[in-house]
Swiss-Prot record:
Molecular functions (GO terms): cytokine activity; cytokine receptor binding; type I interferon receptor binding
Compartments in which it is found: Secreted
Name this polypeptide is given: Interferon alpha-21
Residue runs in coiled coils: none
CDD domains, A to Z: IFab
A cellular-component GO term for this protein: extracellular space
Family: Belongs to the alpha/beta interferon family.
Source superkingdom: Eukaryota
PANTHER family documented for this protein: INTERFERON ALPHA-21, TYPE I INTERFERON
GO annotation terms (biological process): adaptive immune response; B cell activation involved in immune response; cellular response to virus; defense response to virus; humoral immune response; natural killer cell activation involved in immune response; response to exogenous dsRNA; T cell activation involved in immune response
Organism: Homo sapiens (Human)
Gene name of this polypeptide: IFNA21
Disulfide cysteine pairs (residue numbers): 24-122, 52-162
InterPro entries documented for this protein: 4_helix_cytokine-like_core (IPR009079), Interferon_alpha/beta/delta (IPR000471)
Free-text function comment from the UniProt entry: Produced by macrophages, IFN-alpha have antiviral activities. Interferon stimulates the production of two enzymes: a protein kinase and an oligoadenylate synthetase.
Length: 189
């Protein structure tokens, strides 16, 4: 069962206060949230990854979008935001709800939602107005296509437990790679 609307609204309302007073220390706040999300993803594992080796798949993580130094901070935040938004969407489906232990899935979704709110506040602070910055459209598109490949894979595998395990491992990998990206941003500041 998907997260109830009232639970999501409660999370949004509670997050609103922190958004209004949040200073944008992207590497610090997002890195902490990223670590919590990784821990929750690790706890969500229900079957041995070794039993799913035949289902492994290369989803073509857009590494080059996270390697470049061409990003302004606001653009980098937008790419991270898109990755987390797509992850949130993926794990908010009814097929996802049927696969994972409900309380862990809710905690994971809440953590992703908080990260999205924090990143939105950072974009606003970086740009100085409540409009999204000009962003690297190609990078955002690359992230969207990456998640389309993941969704297509799940559909082709009929949302099997092994398919979800492969996807869970892939998302953990992408979060780990985004952490490296954030550390690079921190060094640039």
């Amino acid at each position: 069962m998907a997260l109830s609307f009232s639970l999501l609204m409660a999370v949004l309302v509670l997050s609103y206060k922190s958004i209004c007073s949040l200073g944008c220390d992207l590497p610090q706040t997002h890195s902490l949230g990223n670590r919590r999300a990784l821990i929750l993803l690790a706890q969500m594992g229900r079957i041995s990854p070794f039993s799913c080796l035949k289902d492994r798949h290369d989803f073509g993580f857009p590494q080059e979008e996270f390697d470049g130094n061409q990003f302004q901070k606001a653009q980098a935040i937008s790419v991270l935001h898109e990755m987390i938004q797509q992850t949130f969407n993926l794990f908010s489906t009814k097929d996802s709800s049927a696969t994972w232990e409900q309380s862990l899935l809710e905690k994971f979704s809440t953590e992703l939602n908080q990260q999205l709110n924090d990143l939105e506040a950072c974009v606003i602070q970086e740009v100085g107005v409540e409009e999204t910055p000009l962003m690297n459209v190609d990078s955002i598109l690359a992230v969207k296509k990456y998640f389309q490949r993941i969704t297509l894979y799940l559909t082709e595998k009929k949302y099997s437990p092994c398919a979800w395990e492969v996807v869970r491992a892939e998302i953990m990998r992408s979060f780990s790679l985004s952490k490296i990206f954030q550390e690079r941003l921190r060094r640039k500041e």
